[in-house]
UniProtKB/Swiss-Prot annotation:
Gene designation: Cdkl5
Organism: Mus musculus
The organism's place on the tree of life at top rank: Eukaryota
Residues annotated as domain Protein kinase: 13-297
Subcellular location field: Nucleus; Cytoplasm, Cytoskeleton, Cilium basal body; Cytoplasm, Cytoskeleton, Microtubule organizing center, Centrosome
Active site: D135 (proton acceptor)
A biological-process GO annotation: protein localization to nucleus
Family: Belongs to the protein kinase superfamily. CMGC Ser/Thr protein kinase family. CDC2/CDKX subfamily.
Chief place where the protein resides: nucleus
Subunit comment: Interacts with MECP2.
Enzyme class: transferase
Name the record gives this protein: Cyclin-dependent kinase-like 5
Residues at which ATP binds: V19, G20, E21, G22, A23, Y24, G25, V26, V27, K42
Record region (Disordered): 298-348, 382-566, 646-865, 877-938
Amino acid sequence: MKIPNIGNVMNKFEILGVVGEGAYGVVLKCRHKETHEIVAIKKFKDSEENEEVKETTLRELKMLRTLKQENIVELKEAFRRRGKLYLVFEYVEKNMLELLEEMPNGVPPEKVKSYIYQLIKAIHWCHKNDIVHRDIKPENLLISHNDVLKLCDFGFARNLSEGNNANYTEYVATRWYRSPELLLGAPYGKSVDMWSVGCILGELSDGQPLFPGESEIDQLFTIQKVLGPLPSEQMKLFYSNPRFHGLRFPAVNHPQSLERRYLGILNSVLLDLMKNLLKLDPADRYLTEQCLNHPTFQTQRLLDRSPSRSTKRKPYHVESSTLSNRNQSTKGAALQTHHRSNSKDIQNLSVGLPRAEEGLPANESFLNGNLAGATLSPMHTKTYQASTQPGSSSKDLTNNNIPHLLSPKEAKSKTEFDFNIDTKPSEGPGTKYLKSSTRSQQNRHSFMESSQSKAGTLQPSEKQSRHSYIDTIPQSSRSPSYRTKAKSHGALSDSKSVSNLSEARAQITETNTSRYFPSSCLDLNSPTSPTPTRHTDTRTLLSPSGRNNRNEGTLDSRRTTTRHSKTMEELKLPEHMDSSHSHSLSAPHESFSYGLGYTSPFSSQQRPHRHSMYVTRDKVRAKGLDGSLSIGQGMAARANSLQLLSPQPGEQLPPEMTVARPSVKESSREGASSFHTRQKSEGGVYHDPHSDDGTAPKENRHLYNDPVPRRVGSFYRVPSPRPDNSFHENNVSTRVSSLPSDSSSGTNHSKRQPGFDPWKSPENISHADQLKEKEKQGFFRSMKKKKKKTQTVPNTDGPDLLTLQKAIHSSSTASSRPKEWRPEKLSDLQTQSQPLKSLRKLLHLSSSTNHPASSDPRFQPLTAQQAKNSFSEIRIHPLSQATGGSSNIRQEPTPKGRPALQLPGSSLLRYNGWKHSRSRSSQPDEVIFLASHEKWKQ
């Protein structure tokens, strides 16, 4: 039925709100005004003007008209209005994304199995019709109030029967759920959907995304940190892909593994399914039929066989006029099963198998469409697995390309929307699979058959499947698998395939792991049962200083650890725990974990918000609050927005680490290099430590790894530690350093800077005590003149007042400034344009403090004479002068040295290092002092 272009159809609905917004339109929640039924209407953008939108719209409509199954969202109506297409769907209350918001620590195991089973059934029906969804993610999985899962959004789905010339888009599927072959730009098939199922299975289990990569290259490395290095064939594709030109993966000799990642969260049976869904080699990955027969779904299969569900059977499933006589033997069994259940699908699947002359068991051995457990097991041999695959992956619709979709009506004009929503009797799933089942013999070379043995070659065939996993491999190719020379990559040169791969293998097979890994984790991959004693030094091994294993000329470990490597890997309990360990299930992540040391060199640490990688979404996902872990839930609370921007190792921190940086006690051990590195890393979140001593990565890791927001933000409020506990000493320093006292010189310096007493220069020590009084008089005399000069020339601008207040508040004088302070840190106390104003202010304040003493009439005549003598003596005998000149030189001329063209840092170092230069030669400083004294005399 052709949908007329009428403008009043939308008037039947009352718009209640906006459900969501996607790349090609908006989804509205509406109520039918007559029936009061709640529906979801997907309103596409201007499809008449935009060819891409039109193509996507047509594709989705074709898919939805074909896919009638209980776990696929139902298309109720389609109409056009003002050039825009409207699709009316059943309304489902929420999606899995919102479910994960409500349950930040994951879903109970039974619900996980139920959701995954329903998802696999929906994908199985798609794959039976040669449709690959390619964008399976929590946002596209709707969940009703009675926990029925619905797969939606077929805008990126692809019909595999479109042939060799089909333009298979590489950028499909949200990045976190994209398979390695998609990321590498390799030919792909149905297994890309199965990879997404494995990722969702992990995310449902603990509430955290399994592979949260922030770019294609980072996604590939994030996968390898858990699953290990890519196979050599995929490495070839990586090095030959121009997008990754010049890049190289760091060695991952000790991947975290799914066992460690989900220890205490997934049972062994469900973990086995997950491992088979997340095989790096797509040829080894489970397809839908193998998943549905997995022992973990035994309860769900029994529920599907329940007779009470057979009453929901739709008549169009058995009214097909195209059923052949060969179908009669299974037609009776088909009536016993639910029309939308997977059992019916597999029965239909088994109908066409005798035509393909496959050596399968008789149809009677199928229970509800599934082989009996003794006959078909997920642990059965690979040859038998491969022999059962044509049913689930044969391309039996190649001949007519789903005739009712590509009907002659659509050949008239591609701009016409010809959408017959009413299903014909011949369009039932039972018959759809049989229309071209005679072609199944010619289409046996589907993607799963290509792996009958890992190194087996494909059998040549005239009618090789055009839509199989190897559809882009040249016909002349007789290579082991899909990953040889794909058209999209060109030939591999010797330099690419030999030298680069040898370098990669050298990294992967590197045996000198003790250089990068603590001895406690060297034998974690050994087949023997490890000893439990390796956890004794867990707390000291948290620093990545011993685990930066990527300083080998690759993209080095320049970034703090990724969110995944912390929250996903560091918090997961290693597999090597046995019964002798004392870790409880409620907190299984306190142990040293395997993927801990793999900092992603491809990560910028600004993790994208969940599920926002493909479509820009206005709604930022609210993360769950931090809460205690329940038994069996081994992860921290669902990441909040702060965690998405930085890696969070969480429980791995020792309990005493309540601030986001190492304690002062740690800083005294780490020396000067770690202190300077820490000061740089505190400036911003994304500083990249390049030091080789391993301490800087430790600082960064402690800086950004707290899972609680208040602790993440606390490092803005806690003063940075100083070397050798001077963090505390600077705060208690007094301002009496202008007086002849030892209090300031003894407490305000670190080990590397000996204390300096301005009153005890070498000349002072050699002179008699009667000169001390003259020193004081000369000092106070110069102070008084200085005060008069500053009163006549007001220069107390805003920054000076601010720096003066800061200086008074911190009670730090010029002599108490550590020599290690960098010039950039001085900007906290003074402006860069006038670096020594604060010193002048400090000295000026000291003179005002001692003003009663300086105004004493006994000192004034002596001070005037003493000042003249000292100034003249400095000119003639600079090194022998030991009276008032020493105090004047030490305390006073430095502010007047500002007119000399010096950098702020050099001026301060000259100020602090006066004691060193004076003992050797005073010539550099004398120039400044002479100019200053000449000015004073005027």
